[in-house]
Each structure stands twice: as C-alpha cells, then as structure tokens.
C-alpha cells in the first residue's frame, strides 16, 4: 500500500552547559533581503546501516538552501563545512541555530565571530524560532526521504541533491507568491557574483553539484541583492 513506518529518531540538538548561548535576535526583526539572516540545523536520515545526518543552511528571506552536507556524524566540523560552502554566496548578517552543542561550541562560535556574523540561538525547546528550516525538513522528509527509502549514503546524497536542486530552482513557493527560491535569492545578481568554476569542481568531486548551480532565468523584477 506504499505505507512507511516512521520511528522516533535521535535527538540532534543536545546542548552542553559549558558552551556559549547567545540571545535570539530574530524576534521582531524585519527580514527583508537575502543574506540578512541564514538559519542552520541538522536532521537525521535512517539508512539500513544506521543514521546519517543532513546539515542545511537556509536563507530566511528567500527560502533558498545556500548549502548542505550529508555526514555520518553530527559533529560541529560538519556544520562549519556547510557554512564554508555557503560563503561563496556571501556572508550573512545573522546566523540562527538551536542550542545544540554543534552550534554553541567553540569551533562554530569562533568561526562565525571571525567572519563578523552575529550569532543567534533559539530559545530552549522552541523549534518555532527556527521555523524556516523546520518547514524545509518537513518538506524534504515527506516528499523525498520517506518515499525513496534510501539504502546507502551515496544514494541518499545523490537523491537529496536532486531534490534540493528542484526545491531551489524549479519549485514555486506559496509564501514567495509562487516564485522559486532561486528567483528571489539571485534577483539582480550579476554572473560574476555566482560561484566560481573552481568551486563547482570541488562540489562535483563531493557529489553535491546537483543542488547548486543551474542556469537561472529570472522571470520577475526584484531589487538587487547586496554583494
């Protein structure tokens, strides 16, 4: 009948009382442009051999997934790796995360501070504070992961890349007045502002090119995104 059992998964946001927690900066903030706020989070994907973990960064304004990483652990270095990938698109003013140890520990905090990124953390138990990425998790789980039942991390990486590419570049989004996330994110950007060929080759080697760089025809008028 095509039914899929969904079992409870591991907690991905366990805190550490020794780590640094910053205030939540998004309450009452008017978010009007791409690269003003990015949000990061982790979700799990169950394979026959065990769990793998999907890290993703979403641009709050456009819903564009600026970077993602699929890893066999949920340690902080994979969060930093994901942010490093995203920096080809620019540096956000604010990056919001939950209070998991990956995003409150020294490795993550130091990396953001060195880039002059303002750090924002959700309140304890308040997943609604990071609602953009939570809604994306719901979308990718129910429209891709639960339907395809990936068997290997290689298969999952390829399939997730194809889905994220579709989500970014082809799928109209109701909250964006049926624009695509990429149309909003890249509106007014020149080709020179897009990732370099060298970086494309790096992603190709990692098997993640599918999600990132498809030629985009912008079909609406928007204000230019600050470089």
Name each region found by the language model.
Residues 1-34, 180-191:
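Basic, flexible linker segments flanking DNA-binding modules
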Residues 15-17, 97-99, 103-112, 119-141, ...:
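RNase H-like two-metal-ion nuclease catalytic core shared by retroviral integrases
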Residues 31-66, 72-73:
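An active-site-proximal beta-strand-loop segment
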Residues 50, 68-90, 94, 101-104:
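Active-site beta-loop-alpha junctions of metal-dependent nucleic acid enzymes
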Residues 63, 95-98:
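Buried hydrophobic side chains on well-structured beta-strands
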Residues 64-68, 119-122, 146-147:
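Short small-residue beta-strand/loop micro-motif enriched in glycine and branched aliphatics
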Residues 113-115, 139-227:
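C-terminal domain-tail junction helix/linker
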């Amino acid at each position: 009948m095509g039914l899929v059992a969904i079992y409870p998964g591991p907690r991905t946001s366990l805190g550490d009382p020794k780590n640094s927690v910053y205030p939540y900066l998004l309450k009452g903030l008017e978010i009007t442009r791409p690269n003003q706020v990015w949000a990061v989070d982790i979700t799990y994907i169950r394979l026959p051999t065990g769990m793998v973990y999907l890290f993703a960064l979403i641009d709050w304004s456009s819903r564009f997934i600026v970077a993602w990483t699929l890893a066999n652990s949920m340690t902080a270095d994979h969060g930093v790796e994901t942010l490093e990938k995203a920096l080809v698109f620019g540096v956000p003013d604010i990056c919001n995360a939950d209070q998991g140890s990956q995003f409150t520990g020294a490795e993550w905090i130091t990396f953001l501070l060195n880039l002059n990124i303002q750090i924002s953390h959700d309140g304890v138990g308040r997943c609604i504070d990071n609602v953009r990425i939570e809604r994306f998790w719901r979308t990718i789980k129910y429209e891709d992961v639960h339907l395809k039942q990936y068997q290997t991390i290689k298969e999952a990486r390829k399939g997730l890349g194809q889905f994220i590419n579709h989500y970014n570049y082809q799928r109209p989004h109701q909250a964006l007045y049926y624009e695509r996330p990429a149309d909003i994110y890249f509106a007014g950007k020149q080709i020179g502002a897009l990732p370099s060929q060298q970086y494309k080759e790096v992603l190709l080697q990692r098997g993640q090119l599918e999600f990132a760089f498809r030629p985009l025809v912008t079909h609406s008028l928007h204000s230019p995104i600050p470089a």
